[in-house]
Amino acid sequence: MNNTAQQDVSALSFEQAVEELERIVSALERGDVALDKSIEIYERGEALKKHCEALLKAAEDRIEKIRLDRAGRPQGVEPLDAE
């Protein structure tokens, strides 16, 4: 995949990337795409998958849980996966 296509992927929102990835999967499952085109869209699908995973990881890193003291009062926040 060329750099322009990769840049296009990085500009997509999570929802846009998932939607395009679903279209690619459907086209590949139908089997009505020529071999060369199948390889091309498969590679784009891989880039979309990686982009979605990166966006999910970034969102996960931003989520925090509220830490409570013994009386149940908010005491601060900590990463969601602090265990």
Swiss-Prot record:
Biological process terms in GO annotation: DNA catabolic process
Hydrolase recorded as keyword: yes
E.C. no: 3.1.11.6
Keywords: Cytoplasm, Exonuclease, Hydrolase, Nuclease
SS bond list: none
Substrates-to-products reaction catalysed: Exonucleolytic cleavage in either 5'- to 3'- or 3'- to 5'-direction to yield nucleoside 5'-phosphates
GO CC terms, sorted: cytosol; exodeoxyribonuclease VII complex
Location in the cell: Cytoplasm
General function of this protein: Bidirectionally degrades single-stranded DNA into large acid-insoluble oligonucleotides, which are then degraded further into small acid-soluble oligonucleotides.
Family of the protein in this entry: Belongs to the XseB family.
Assembly information from the UniProt record: Heterooligomer composed of large and small subunits.
Name under which the protein is recorded: Exodeoxyribonuclease 7 small subunit
Organism field: Sinorhizobium medicae (strain WSM419)
Lineage: Bacteria, Pseudomonadati, Pseudomonadota, Alphaproteobacteria, Hyphomicrobiales
Recorded name of the encoding gene: xseB
